[in-house]
């Protein structure tokens, strides 16, 4: 059985640091990809990237409540911004190494933003404050199903990775983010755009293997939503 590494958050639970990956990601790897999920911790001393790459066949970079530290792209953070700099220290070097090595990877939500920052891009920290932009945040005080409900359409790049995987030109996606791509990293290319022009998915022009980043959460209904099924099936074929 192929193995897919799932990068964990480092969070406090009952005053203790824990390494966490939501069950939806684990289930999507197990059932949507047909691979063994392997949790990769984000430790205060980052693990050796070469050792990680040697033990897995692919990597999944997950979403998280925290944000990539703005210092990673030369900006400052507002007071109260939730960060996970231990995760940054694990994921950013790992993304660069995986891209260089041609390791198949799928990056979701925070992982999508990490991919852009790791390769030299930057982020808008508060999309809803930009003139003419949608509010990409999830509804407040809503049920979990309502939070992850389809929120807006995305339009795929013609002949791009998502268009080829899904056979679609457009699809509805969920939206649970307040940050997003500002400057696109060298080598990355837009795969999907929201109605306000915000980049919602990327691939890499020089990728040696499957490399896809999406701002939305395909893991939430990976077995039901046609686009999500296509994404995880494409990832599986690349392992």
Where are these regions (language model features)?
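N-terminal beta1-alpha1 cap of cysteine-dependent amidohydrolase-like domains
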Residues: 1-106, 117-124, 128-166, 172, ...
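Conserved G/P- and acidic residue-centered "switch" motifs that form tight phosphate/ATP-binding loops
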Residues: 109
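The feature captures the ABC ATPase H-loop/switch
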Residues: 112
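A short, structured beta-strand/loop element
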Residues: 208-210
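Active-site-proximal beta-strand elements of phosphoester/diester hydrolases
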Residues: 212-215
């Amino acid at each position: 059985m192929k193995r897919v590494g799932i990068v964990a958050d480092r969070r406090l639970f009952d005053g203790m640091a824990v390494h966490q990956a939501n069950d939806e990601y684990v289930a999507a790897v197990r059932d949507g990809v047909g691979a063994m999920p392997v949790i990769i911790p984000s430790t205060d001393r980052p693990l050796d990237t070469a050792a990680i790459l040697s033990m897995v066949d692919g990597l999944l970079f997950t979403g998280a409540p925290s944000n990539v530290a703005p210092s990673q792209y030369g900006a400052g953070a507002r007071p109260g911004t939730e960060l996970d700099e231990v995760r940054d220290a694990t994921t950013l070097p790992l993304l660069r190494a995986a891209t260089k090595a041609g390791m198949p990877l799928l990056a979701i939500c925070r992982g999508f933003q990490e991919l852009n920052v790791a390769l030299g891009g930057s982020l808008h920290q508060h999309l809803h404050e930009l003139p003419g932009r949608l509010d990409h945040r999830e509804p407040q005080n809503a049920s979990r199903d309502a939070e992850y409900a389809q929120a807006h359409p995305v339009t795929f790049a013609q002949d791009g990775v998502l268009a080829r995987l899904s056979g679609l030109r457009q699809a509805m996606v969920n939206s649970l983010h307040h940050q997003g791509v500002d400057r696109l990293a060298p080598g990355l290319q837009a795969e999907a755009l929201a109605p306000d022009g915000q980049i919602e998915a990327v691939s890499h022009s020089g990728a040696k293997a499957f490399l896809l980043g999406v701002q939305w959460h395909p893991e939430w209904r990976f077995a039901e939503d046609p686009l999500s099924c296509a994404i995880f099936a494409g990832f599986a074929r690349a392992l």
